[in-house]
């Protein structure tokens, strides 16, 4: 779970850095996601290396700050789109601040916070998050995150007219994964989730491969990688696809909890 939170935080750090640099940090609040995502990434590394079965207050605070930053960022992006001429038109949805992007740091915070709740579970006891079974709760969070990330990818790939057939993968594979996680979350104990586990691995691979496809997309712009300083800003966002990998890792962690604790 800490690795999942860290993967999401790293994606946000790189993506928001590029996009907000392109926007010249016109609003000073645009520095916030960079600072918070860097803190969240460092916190996830600390959590991964910490073997103590006790929640850490500083990690909790950082993860909650990340979640709050995601909510606030969504509000800023909604305002940015709504204030433009035409409001929530296709043109503005395509080219103004991406509505779904800040939710990635929210998800990083939620997954990280869940990891701390699982960590503080006593041996032999069912891991819970606010009295809810931990595995099923995390599966629901990861599934919802996959649907939201699919919506963001679908909007931008629709803008690109799906000119490459592989652009259909991020809008077809993740919803299936979300349904599988929802089924796992709603199902009873003792079920075999082998296919769902395999599908999460497929989504993780898709997220990594997506960064490669985006790198190829950058190379197709005028000047290719020789003109990287311009094309990396205007080409497909390199750090965006790994967010699918982060959510897939969270899904795998949820399935692992349900395997070890059938009632979790």
Each PLM stretch: what is its role?
Residues 1-264:
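Short amphipathic, positively biased membrane-proximal segments
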């Amino acid at each position: 779970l800490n690795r999942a939170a860290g993967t999401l935080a790293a994606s946000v750090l790189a993506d928001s850095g590029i996009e907000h640099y392109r926007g010249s940090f016109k609003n000073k609040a645009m520095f916030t996601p960079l600072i918070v995502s860097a803190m969240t990434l460092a916190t996830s590394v600390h959590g991964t290396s910490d073997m103590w079965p006790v929640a850490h207050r500083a990690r909790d605070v950082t993860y909650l700050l990340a979640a709050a930053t995601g909510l606030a960022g969504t509000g800023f992006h909604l305002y940015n789109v709504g204030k433009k001429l035409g409001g929530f038109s296709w043109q503005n949805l395509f080219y103004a601040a991406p509505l779904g992007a800040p939710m990635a740091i929210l998800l990083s915070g939620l997954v990280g916070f869940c990891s701390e709740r699982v960590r503080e579970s006593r041996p032999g006891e069912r891991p819970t998050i606010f009295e809810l079974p931990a595995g099923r709760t995390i599966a629901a969070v990861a599934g919802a995150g996959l649907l939201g990330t699919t919506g963001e990818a679908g909007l931008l790939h629709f803008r690109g007219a799906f000119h490459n057939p592989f652009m259909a993968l991020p809008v077809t594979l993740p919803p299936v994964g979300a349904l599988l996680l929802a089924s796992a979350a709603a199902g009873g104990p003792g079920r075999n989730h082998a296919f769902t586990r395999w599908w999460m691995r497929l989504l993780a691979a898709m997220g990594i491969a997506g960064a490669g496809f985006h790198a190829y997309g950058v190379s197709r712009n005028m000047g290719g990688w020789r003109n990287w300083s311009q094309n990396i800003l205007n080409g497909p966002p390199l750090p965006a696809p790994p967010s699918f990998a982060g959510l897939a890792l969270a899904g795998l962690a949820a399935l692992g909890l349900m395997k070890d604790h059938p009632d979790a």
